[in-house]
């Protein structure tokens, strides 16, 4: 991507919200102001006029006026938003023990063994992460260790996450986040 192309939209994110340019009602403008005050600049809003979502159910997201949007983008494509089994399992486990994997605990091993049972035998270990950023960072580290290489090819508007290494592979974060030295568009 040329420098001119990178500068053609805010933060290199096409269709991004630009403060003062969207057609937002006052209550949404107030939410934008709160976001700008409380959240870091990497938390960009999608769309020239951001959608004010209030809930999700299955494949649908709903805005404050009740309008439904088919979610083909967000982070829960495999089970949908607020799947009752996931909500119940999360509540059940949170009521018992909610911590990381650095302690002995049966549940994390039960889950790991059940998941690994679905994989070929040469995929015999797993590493759990909390976010896609962490998962992509780990995948990059594994790829580098396995191949000895460091190169990474991305598309112009790619988003892979916000860890230090992975942000450098995410041109959509904008010109304020330099691309990594081994990244090629």
Give names to the regions the model predicted.
Residues 24, 28, 54, 58, ...:
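Generic structural signal for well-ordered, non-membrane alpha-helical segments
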Residues 53, 79, 167-169:
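Short clusters of hydrophobic/aromatic residues that line enzyme substrate/ligand-binding pockets
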């Amino acid at each position: 991507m040329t420098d001119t192309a990178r500068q053609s939209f805010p933060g290199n994110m096409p269709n991004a919200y630009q403060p003062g340019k969207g057609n937002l009602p006052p209550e949404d403008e107030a939410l934008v102001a709160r976001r700008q005050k409380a959240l870091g600049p990497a938390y960009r809003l999608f769309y020239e006029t951001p959608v004010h979502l209030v809930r999700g159910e299955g494949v649908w997201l709903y805005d404050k006026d009740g309008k439904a949007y088919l979610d083909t983008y967000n982070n829960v494509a495999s089970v949908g938003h607020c799947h009752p089994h996931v909500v119940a399992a999360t509540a059940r486990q949170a009521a018992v023990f909610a911590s990381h994997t650095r302690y002995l605990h049966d549940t994390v091993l039960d889950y790991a063994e059940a998941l690994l049972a679905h994989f070929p035998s040469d995929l015999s270990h797993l590493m759990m992460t909390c976010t896609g950023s962490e998962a992509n960072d780990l995948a990059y580290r594994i790829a580098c260790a396995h191949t000895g290489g460091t190169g990474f090819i991305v598309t112009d508007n790619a988003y892979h996450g916000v860890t230090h290494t992975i942000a450098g592979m995410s041109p959509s974060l904008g010109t304020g986040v330099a691309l990594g030295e081994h990244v090629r568009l």
